[in-house]
Structure formats: structure tokens, C-alpha cells
Amino acid sequence: KNFALAILVVTFVVAVFGNTNLDPPTRPTRLRREAKPEAEPGNNRPVYIPQPRPPHPRLRREAEPEAEPGNNRPVYIPQPRPPHPRLRREAELEAEPGNNRPVYISQPRPPHPRLRREAEPEAEPGNNRPVYIPQPRPPHPRLRREAELEAEPGNNRPVYISQPRPPHPRLRREAEPEAEPGNNRPVYIPQPRPPHPRLRREAEPEAEPGNNRPVYIPQPRPPHPRLRREAEPEAEPGNNRPVYIPQPRPPHPRLRREAKPEAKPGNNRPVYIPQPRPPHPRI
């Protein structure tokens, strides 16, 4: 029994402490095998040849008639289509047959009504720009053009004689009795009107009859109370400034004027004798 126990102890010691290599364990090496392009018939990866498909319809590729038979890009010849109506391309009658751009001759159309082009009677027959002679139309009412009676027949600007109209009421033009008959500016004699009340104009009795500024004699009015004007008894009758004699008023209490007993009777400044007052207590 002791002998069996000793065998077990020796076996355990040898199993635990028997590794005498002090170096750390290394990673096992992996074998790197090269690819085998010549796969044996037992390889289960099939050889796949995709079916050719046409390219996208919006991709316009040129035909490749010399493509080798082993090329899987198909030979695609797109159908010709007319260009956009807004693209006015000149016809290419000498285009080579191998060119896949179609020969397109667009129908002529008249230009925009706002585009006034001169007629081109000498245009060559191969030019697809039509010869367009626009219909004459009267100009805008606000455009006062002079009539062109001597305009040549080939000029497409119409001869327009506008109707005369009176000018704006705020535009005071002088009458033109000597205007020539071919002038389309009417002879306008405005009605006289009185000037603004705040405009004090002197009367013009000698104004000529042809002057359209009326002779206006304003009514006299008294001046402002704060305007102390001296009386003008010798004013001429034609002067429209009225003769105004203001009423005398006492001066300001703080204004100590000395009395002037020798003042002339024609002076309209009153003779004022202030009442005496006692002096200041601090003086």
C-alpha cells in the first residue's frame, strides 16, 4: 500500500516539474500555400461567363465594328432622334454616312413679336432663318414721335401722326401762334389763375396783352402784431402795402426808458413817463 502511494507521488512530481525548458512557448508556424491556377477537375468553383447586356439608353457610345469576337461589350448602334426644338442646328447635308448624328432640317418659324428684325430679301436659299416682315403697329401713346412723311417705303417703322392733347395743367407754356402747321405740339393758351395767397406780387398795369400772367392786386391786410412798422403817410397810391398806424403800448417793466418830452408829433412811439420806484434794499 505504501509502495503504490509512493508511485503516485513520483508520477505527480514528474508531471508537474518535469518541464525544464525555461524559454517562453512559441507560436506554431503556418504553412503558406501558393495559389493553384491550374485547379484540378475536382475544384467546385464553376467557370462563369456572363451574358452580354446592352448599355444604358442615355449612354451614346460609338459603334465598334472592329471589336474582337471575344469582347463581351456588345456593338450598340442607337436609334437617331431629332434634336431639341429649341436647338436650331444648321443642316449637315455633307455629313458622312458613318456619323450617327441625324441630319435634321427644322421647320422655319416666325421670330418673337418683340424682336423687330429687318427683312433680308437677299438671304441665300440654304439659310433656314425665315424672311420675316413684321406688321406695323402704332407706337406707345406716351411716345410722342414726329411724323416721318419722307420715310422710305422699305422702312418698317410706321408713319404715325399722334393726336394733339393739351399739356398738363401744371405746365404753363407760352402760346406759339407762329408755329408751323407740321408741328404736332398744340397751341395751348392756359386760363389765367390768381397766384397763391402767400405770394404778394406787385401789380403790373403796364403788362402787355399777350402776357398770360394775370394782373393781380391783392387786398391789403394788416401786418403781424409783432411787426412794428413806421407809418408811411407819403406812400404812393400804387403801393399795395397798407398804411398801418399801430396803437401805442407801454414798454416792458424791465425796460427803463427816459421820457422824451421833445418828441415830434409825427413819431408814433408814445411818450412814456414811468412811475418812480424805490431802489433795491441792498444798494
Curated annotation (Swiss-Prot):
Q: What does this protein do?
A: Apidaecins have bactericidal activity; predominantly against Gram-negative bacteria. They seem to interfere with cell propagation.
Which GO cellular component terms, listed alphabetically, does the Swiss-Prot or TrEMBL entry include?
extracellular region
Protein species of origin: Apis mellifera
- For this entry, the protein name equals Apidaecins type 73
Which residues does the annotated region (Disordered) include? Answer: 19-283
Q: Which residue stretches does the UniProt record annotate as biased composition, category Pro residues?
A: 273-283
- Any idea which UniProt keywords this protein has? Antibiotic, Antimicrobial, Cleavage on pair of basic residues, Immunity, Innate immunity, Repeat, Secreted, Signal
Note the InterPro entries from the entry. Apidaecin
What are the boundaries of the signal sequence?
1-18
- Residue stretch(es) of the prosequence: 19-41, 62-69, 90-97, 118-125, 146-153, 174-181, 202-209, 230-237, 258-265
